[in-house]
């Protein structure tokens, strides 16, 4: 099976220049592909696919425009991957799965340096370093995290990315699938929410990490840093003496705080999923939440976004497939919170402010725990 490993790297100054040059070229090619297809559309011509654009770029455009020779100085695999990503963006737009593709902006868009294993000497990994095509050996900050090549593991492909002044490598490694022992326990249901991140049907409650003093302190620092950055931009508009270098320094501070908060939230999700899977349930049932609809509520949108429900579902699906656990997804219209787990009566007048479920049969239970138990026992579901 293929598994991705992402860790921070410590490149040299020369390697940093190559990474910046490759990422900048990939961003330019992505935007050029979008612009070229827009021109063809305005001229009444047909859409150009990624393969056709790659042939046209190398055989017609670059020979006639020698001033763009720098495109050939970076890895061809990275350039082709940028074209494929742009073609995928158009394909999603044509199938009404996303909006029209937008240009990638420097410093704001997520662009990566893609690499692939072309020969046996490429993508070789040791305990403390990894060999990347066009970069050579790059030191790893977390030693031993990526499986070493000497142990028989093969890196198929990967990508180098930047975020908040740090450099990361993501490697797709071919590893043997773990063998399921078959000693599963009873199935569980998980109710996700804003008061608590997750409530499991066995009574386990995972707290909302965004309500901790640690996150609130970082968010307070972030607000101050953003106000400071905003004042620098305002002073620049007024013509006052504000250096661009100071703006870049303050922008990096804001990015680092964003990155720190994101890492804490992601780490919390990973730990929750790991703890749930280690109980070895026969099945896990979750609800198909309407995240896009919840985000339209301006009073709840920030809280919903900070919980990262979609990331939780994606990682839980991967982990369940890895350990042979069945992941069940219940329809979003299933009234898990309104059904009494004792007598199956539906309480239609249940409000969002009612945190305790009280049924006419005498059953009294926490609202989220009652919903988790109903999800566990749901009979209509889809296997993810």
Question: Which residue ranges define each predicted feature?
Answer:
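Surface-exposed helix-capping loop/turn segments at secondary-structure junctions
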Residues: 38-42, 94-100, 282, 320-327
């Amino acid at each position: 099976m293929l598994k991705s490993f992402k860790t921070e790297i410590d490149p040299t100054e020369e390697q940093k220049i190559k990474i910046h040059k490759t990422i900048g070229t990939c961003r330019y090619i992505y935007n050029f592909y979008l612009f070229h297809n827009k021109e063809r559309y305005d001229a009444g011509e047909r859409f150009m696919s990624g393969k056709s654009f790659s042939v046209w770029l190398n055989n017609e455009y670059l020979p006639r425009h020698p001033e763009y020779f720098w495109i050939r100085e970076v890895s061809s695999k990275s350039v082709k991957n940028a074209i494929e990503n742009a073609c995928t963006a158009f394909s999603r737009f044509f199938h009404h799965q996303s909006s029209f593709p937008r240009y990638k902006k420097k410093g704001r868009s997520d662009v990566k340096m893609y690499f692939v294993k072309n020969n046996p000497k490429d993508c070789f990994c040791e305990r403390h370093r990894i060999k990347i095509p066009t970069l050579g050996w790059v030191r790893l900050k977390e030693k031993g995290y990526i499986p070493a090549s000497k142990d028989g593991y093969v890196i198929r492909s990967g990508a180098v990315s930047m975020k908040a002044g740090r450099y990361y490598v993501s490697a797709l490694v071919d590893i043997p699938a773990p063998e399921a022992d078959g000693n599963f326990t009873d199935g569980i249901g998980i109710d996700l929410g804003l008061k608590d991140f997750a409530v499991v049907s066995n009574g386990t409650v995972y707290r909302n990490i965004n309500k901790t003093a640690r996150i609130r302190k970082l968010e307070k620092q972030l607000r101050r840093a953003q106000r400071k950055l905003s004042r620098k931009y305002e002073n620049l508009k007024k013509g006052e003496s504000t250096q661009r270098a100071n703006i870049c320094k303050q922008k990096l501070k804001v990015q680092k705080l964003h990155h720190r908060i994101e890492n804490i939230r992601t780490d919390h999700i990973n730990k929750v999923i790991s703890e749930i899977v280690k109980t070895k349930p026969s099945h896990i049932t979750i609800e198909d939440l309407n995240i896009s609809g919840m985000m339209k509520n301006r009073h709840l949108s920030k809280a919903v976004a900070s919980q990262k429900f979609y990331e939780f579902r994606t990682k839980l699906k991967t982990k369940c497939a890895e350990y042979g656990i069945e992941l069940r997804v219940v329809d979003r219209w299933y009234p898990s919170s309104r059904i009494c787990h004792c007598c199956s009566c539906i309480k239609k007048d249940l409000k969002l402010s009612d945190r305790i479920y009280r049924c006419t049969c005498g059953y009294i239970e926490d609202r989220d725990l009652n919903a988790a138990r109903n999800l566990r026992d749901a009979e209509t579901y889809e296997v993810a």
